[in-house]
């Protein structure tokens, strides 16, 4: 029988053993939780080579879902960026911060949190690509867009984010070109107008000329004011100020800037606000396709307004009207970006096959002396005597000749041909 004095040391031993178990069990639980989290991260990241490499480099530790201040800062910055995705015309359904935060709160187990960790990284990379270089692949939208999208390295993107100020890094992803800034500002302005009265009533008249009066003139005035082409005015007459506003509108939309609101101008003025907003969103996407350094000196050809500009250090030093291919068939001008390789002085113009067989051959069949300023050449490049050719025997498929306009002041290409590497 143990006396109380004898039992005391034994009780101390049992107490120490119990305390040791109490300390060991939580440690084991914590280790198990860490292991479950990292295992879930490893398994989820394995589906994406870039994420697998990224998380392997950090021993499958998280950077979004933890309780640390840095994790919380990254998480908040990402949710703030997602909430502004619509301002950039991006599909907001891809990154709905409310849904994502609800999923985060629902992730109670370490394994669920590990899977959510990788999902946040996947969403971050998706957002980074969308806002940097566009949601769509150009060649899959329009076949004549021969543009290589300047995709960034996904690994470099997520690694750079981890090592940077989260909010600053996310802000720097969008294009910084003046064009993109103007488009975004216009998008926000149009969205504000959508919540008001829009552009107001459409112009009912088929055409309007300076000196006109009436309800259609008032509608035209109000739409020009709302669009930003005319200062506020109460005029009910198509006066000088309205004529100048119409000219500004025409110039901005690739129309003949004569100050007369003809059928084409009225049609353009009457385009609904919602359609204008969609045009802005499309233009912003196109700007994202171009989100790469353009060089201190570059040539910018705007197909939509028929202009070509030389830009030196963000300043236009030369501007000219330019000829753009028709939208039908193979005449459409391609869209591309590349380095100019060389130029040709006093060039010859080699007529495209489509123009030869669709325009010139029918004229030559009616009159062999037609388009006399153009030479007809054989497969060796020798000039053919057109009077010796029976053009009526040929079809568009069988016509064996080429056509060339020699160098001259009247040459279709002018006196200098800048050689872009057309696709």
Model-derived regions, located:
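N-terminal secretory signal peptides that target proteins for export/translocation
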Residues: 1-9
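Short amphipathic alpha-helical segments with coiled-coil-like heptad repeat character
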Residues: 3-4, 132, 314-317
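Bacterial N-terminal signal peptides
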Residues: 13-24
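Sec/Tat signal peptide C-region and signal peptidase I cleavage site
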Residues: 25-32
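Well-ordered beta-sheet/strand-loop patches within structured domains
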Residues: 32-50, 54-56, 118, 122-125, ...
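Cationic-aromatic interfacial patches
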Residues: 33-148
């Amino acid at each position: 029988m143990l006396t109380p004095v004898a039992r005391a040391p034994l009780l101390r031993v049992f107490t120490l053993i119990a305390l040791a178990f109490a300390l060991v069990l939580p440690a084991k639980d914590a280790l198990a939780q860490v292991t479950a989290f990292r295992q879930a991260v490893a398994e989820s990241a394995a589906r994406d080579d870039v994420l697998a490499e990224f998380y392997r480099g950090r021993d499958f530790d998280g950077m979004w879902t933890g309780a640390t201040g840095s994790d919380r800062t990254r998480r908040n910055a990402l949710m703030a960026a997602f909430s502004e995705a619509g301002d950039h015309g991006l599909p907001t359904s891809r990154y709905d911060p409310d849904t994502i935060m609800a999923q985060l709160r629902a992730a109670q187990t370490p394994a669920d949190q590990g899977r959510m960790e990788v999902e946040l990284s996947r969403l971050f990379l998706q957002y980074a690509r969308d806002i940097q270089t566009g949601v769509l692949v150009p060649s899959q939208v329009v076949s004549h867009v021969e543009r290589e999208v300047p995709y960034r390295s996904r690994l470099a993107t997520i690694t750079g984010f981890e090592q940077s100020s989260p909010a600053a890094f996310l802000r720097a992803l969008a294009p910084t070109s003046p064009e993109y800034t103007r488009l975004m500002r216009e998008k926000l302005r149009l969205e504000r107008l959508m919540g008001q009265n829009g552009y107001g009533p459409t112009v009912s008249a088929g055409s309007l000329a300076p000196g006109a009066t009436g309800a259609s003139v008032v509608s035209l005035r109000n739409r020009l004011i709302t669009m930003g082409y005319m200062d506020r005015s109460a005029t009910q007459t198509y006066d000088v100020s309205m004529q100048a506003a119409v000219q500004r509108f025409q110039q901005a939309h690739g129309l003949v800037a004569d100050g007369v609101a003809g059928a084409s101008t009225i049609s353009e003025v009457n385009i609904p606000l919602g359609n204008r907003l969609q045009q802005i969103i499309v233009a912003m996407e196109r700007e994202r396709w171009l989100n790469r350094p353009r060089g201190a000196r570059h040539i910018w050809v705007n197909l939509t307004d028929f202009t070509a500009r030389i830009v030196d250090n963000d300043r236009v030093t030369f501007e000219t009207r330019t000829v753009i291919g028709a939208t039908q068939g193979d005449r459409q001008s391609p869209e591309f970006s590349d380095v100019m390789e060389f130029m040709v002085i006093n060039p010859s113009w080699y007529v495209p096959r489509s123009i030869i067989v669709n325009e010139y051959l029918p004229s030559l069949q009616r009159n062999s002396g037609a388009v006399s300023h153009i030479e007809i050449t054989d497969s060796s490049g020798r000039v053919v005597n057109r009077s010796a050719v029976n053009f009526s025997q040929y079809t568009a498929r069988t016509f064996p000749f080429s056509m060339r306009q020699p160098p001259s002041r009247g040459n279709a290409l002018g006196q200098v041909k800048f050689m872009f590497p057309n696709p």
